[in-house]
């Protein structure tokens, strides 16, 4: 009696599944998903709260340090915006190893490009200008003169806020003026707005309420 062989069901071809698995693994292991993007410098963010019962240095507190793009944004998104700080408070972002004070070895012969804002600009411009300042610093936006940059400070004050970029050598005209021009352009300030650069020594010894400008752009 003849026997009929049962039909054999074709075995599914495994390679596509393997390919899918491989693709899936590649997607999970994509370096862009877990490798952080290093910055050229390590930076330290400081906070100052004006408590008159304490010394100036006791009021200055180191918040955190970072050296990657991702860690910068994690920190920035975690802290209060400058516009929400109480009057008398400061944020300072400086290269690691430089303290946000005139007396620091890297600052004592330097100065600052100063942006002054009126009270109405706290809501419209302060946070935008400060973020752009931070991005200028960590992005090394000043070409060959980025090494001259020490850090930046935002002062929140009742009469009007200030933002400044500090450089290490006030006599270095080429570096100072280049930094000032780039900074003014990055902030989107119109040509009619003039910003000034003041040495820390002049600021410390000023006799009136204003300090003379060494340079303007």
From Swiss-Prot:
Phosphorylation increases the ability of the protein to bind to mRNA caps and to form the eIF4F complex. Phosphorylation also enhances its mRNA transport function. Phosphorylation at Ser-209 is not essential for protein synthesis. GO terms for molecular function: DNA-binding transcription factor binding; enzyme binding; eukaryotic initiation factor 4G binding; mRNA cap binding; RNA 7-methylguanosine cap binding; translation initiation factor activity. The modification Phosphothreonine is found at residue 22. GO terms for biological process: mRNA export from nucleus; regulation of translation; translational initiation. The modification Phosphoserine is found at residue 209. It is found in: Cytoplasm, P-body; Cytoplasm; Cytoplasm, Stress granule; Nucleus. Gene3D superfamilies: RNA Cap, Translation Initiation Factor Eif4e. The modification N-acetylalanine is found at residue 2. The keyword Transport applies. Keywords: Acetylation, Cytoplasm, Initiation factor, mRNA transport, Nucleus, Phosphoprotein, Protein biosynthesis, RNA-binding, Translation regulation, Transport. It comes from the Eukaryota. MRNA binds at residues 56-57, 102-103, 157-162, 205-207. GO terms for cellular component: cytoplasm; cytoplasmic stress granule; cytosol; eukaryotic translation initiation factor 4F complex; nuclear body; nuclear speck; nucleus; P-body. Residues 37-40, 73-77, 132-139 are annotated as: EIF4EBP1/2/3 binding. Its main location: cytoplasm. Pfam families: IF4E. Residues 1-27 are annotated as: Disordered. SUPFAM superfamilies: eIF4e-like. eIF4F is a multi-subunit complex, the composition of which varies with external and internal environmental conditions. It is composed of at least EIF4A, EIF4E and EIF4G1/EIF4G3. EIF4E is also known to interact with other partners. Interacts with EIF4ENIF1/4E-T; promotes recruitment to P-bodies and import into the nucleus. Acts in the cytoplasm to initiate and regulate protein synthesis and is required in the nucleus for export of a subset of mRNAs from the nucleus to the cytoplasm which promotes processes such as RNA capping, processing and splicing. Component of the protein complex eIF4F, which is involved in the recognition of the mRNA cap, ATP-dependent unwinding of 5'-terminal secondary structure and recruitment of mRNA to the ribosome. Belongs to the eukaryotic initiation factor 4E family. This is Eukaryotic translation initiation factor 4E. It comes from Oryctolagus cuniculus. The lineage of its organism: Eukaryota, Metazoa, Chordata, Craniata, Vertebrata. The gene is EIF4E.
